[in-house]
Amino acid sequence: MGVTSIAQDSLTVDRLRARLGDFWLNDISFSIAPGQVTALLGHNGAGKTTTLRLIMGIIRKDFGHVSLGGFDHVRDEKEFKQRIGFVQEESFFYKGMTVRELCAFVSPFYGAWNKGLSRQLLQALDLPGDKKLGHLSKGMRTKVSLVLALSHEPSVLLLDEPTSGLDPRARVEILKLLRKVTHEGGTTVLFSTHNLHEVDEIADRLIILDRGRVLAEESLAALRCKTGPSWNLEHYYLALVP
Amino acid sequence: MNIIHLIAKDLRLQRNFVLPLMLLEVTGYLAYALQIPSHIPGVAFGLLHGVALIGDFLICHRTMIAEEKNRALMFIKTLPVSTPEIVIAKFGVNILLVGLNTGILLALWGGGREFGWIEVAPSLTTHLVLVGLTMHWLNNAFFITISLVFSSEHAVWVPFPALFVVITVILNFKQIKIVLHLEPFVDLLQRREALFVGLIWAIIVGFVVMCSWTLKHKRIFA
């Protein structure tokens, strides 16, 4: 399975601000270098999903800028999304469609859709093309989301808790695939998670959100270096976000 | 091209619904129309449009529920598609399905007269076909607008009873025209078919623009 990336662009989020009811997301800023894997951490309600949805334009921002390779996420919406693959925590698909029909529906929207790669991914993830999406388990639907997000060979992959609620086998398969796309394809990844073990396993950097603010933004290698052999992500995280 | 792909997706999703709906409408209409005495002109034709009006509503409801039930607009929004394209495609698929639905009923009317099943007036003219189709597109566009603006197919049920008012107006239009002194206006629109059709299309385009603007400025899309 040859996963390649179409471009090496960095994702920049600058002073992103939005209000959702009584929840405020305040001046979220970060930049992710090409090929870097960044984990978005935080308690429930910290603003992880909101941040990802704001980047994708599903939620309207009040202020701020998001750009990828010079393309603004609102002004150049289509060009921006051509370069991004997004996996939502819940897969909102047409349940009456089969996996193959969904791929056939999504493929024409992407100029760089790779049919061969899509077929390979379906096979590698053991997804039945003729099965209706409504009959798939949550893990299978997440895998379908991943196939859709990767088949146009995006330069950036956004994942909202991709392994939450999955059985260990599906979780391992998804992490294996993520490692492959980042190491072999050089894809930039931003993923939200509650699983610190996963962060330690695949991330290069972490961003910790708390009550709609960025609390910390660190390189894991630098943290490990600073702390030495006593390094423990759980202790570090809990010390920051009590 | 994106609009065409979105329309094709909706047509694929609705393929198992459209045929049974049309069969039901045709048989339901025939069951009533054939019992209407031929000396009451226009009633059978009014009834035909009444059936088509309910068809317009059901088509809108079905195409919107496909998104609502699956929260699929949220998924569509993650694709490289603009909000106006999503809205135009939704109106586009409805225009196609309503055109087909009304077209079949009008063809039934024309065929019925031709073969002598239905003896009452009016005979089918280009004017009647054009005006009939346009009115059904407007009716359907109104329901789509409600549904998109309020992001819920449930919202379309709120103005649903208004359909019966519209059906009553169609059935009694001759009397209403006299009572409300609308004859000069109706005559003008009848003489200037293009003006009438243009006016209705301007309203439909207005609905499309309003939906695009509303969805673009909503806090959460879908």
Predicted ranges, named:
Chain A
Residues G64-D72, E79-F80:
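Conserved ABC transporter NBD signature motif
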Residues L157-E161:
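Catalytic Walker B motif of ABC-type/P-loop ATPase nucleotide-binding domains
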Residues V172-G185:
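Helical segment within the ABC ATPase nucleotide-binding domain
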Residues G186-H194:
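Conserved H-loop
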